[in-house]
Amino acid sequence: LGDVYKRQFQICSQCDPKKDTILFIDPGFPVQRQQVRILGIKHESFDIYDFRAEKLGPKLESYLKQGNVAAIIYSNPNNPAWICLTESELRTIGELATKYDTIVLEDLAYMGMDFRKELGHPFKAPFQATAARYTDNYVLMISGSKIFSYAGQRIAIAAISDKLRNRFYPALKERYGICLLYTSPSPRD
């Protein structure tokens, strides 16, 4: 997933010139923050531990209302702390991402490993908790190599909402000659 993270950070921080910061909800993977530093992208962070449940919304909004946050990244479930965000916390993240037009980078490297409920039956409830139920501004980053315990193999997926994938970004058009977030040039070129 390392390269997937790097690309998401880079693209998200270039969509809107006013939004140049990645917000980390910690604990997270140190390599993600290192990638942001290497790329020269501004970042902020807060630790989820003291801001669970109803405290999450005000804390998250205190960053988003500044208008400079391009993306929010968190791991759910989280390793090594194994913190799992609740459905209401994910709703808060999704709704605020929509309100402030911020992209949610949901790290699902350990998808299905929330052992509070049985998630091991494909196409049957309960399903993986995700902020994608509450916003169209999401990229789900999934690691098949971790989920399926592939020793040595690296398989990753970036699942992007259709609305986000097809969104027009003038800053990307100006910089790269493409106007969409994750596709080749469109007829709007």
Sequence positions of predicted segments:
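Substrate-binding/gating loop at the entrance of the active-site cleft, primarily
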Residues: 24-41
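Active-site phosphate-binding strand-loop segment of PLP-dependent enzymes
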Residues: 50-121
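Conserved small/polar residues in nucleotide/adenosyl-binding loops
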Residues: 1-8, 182-189
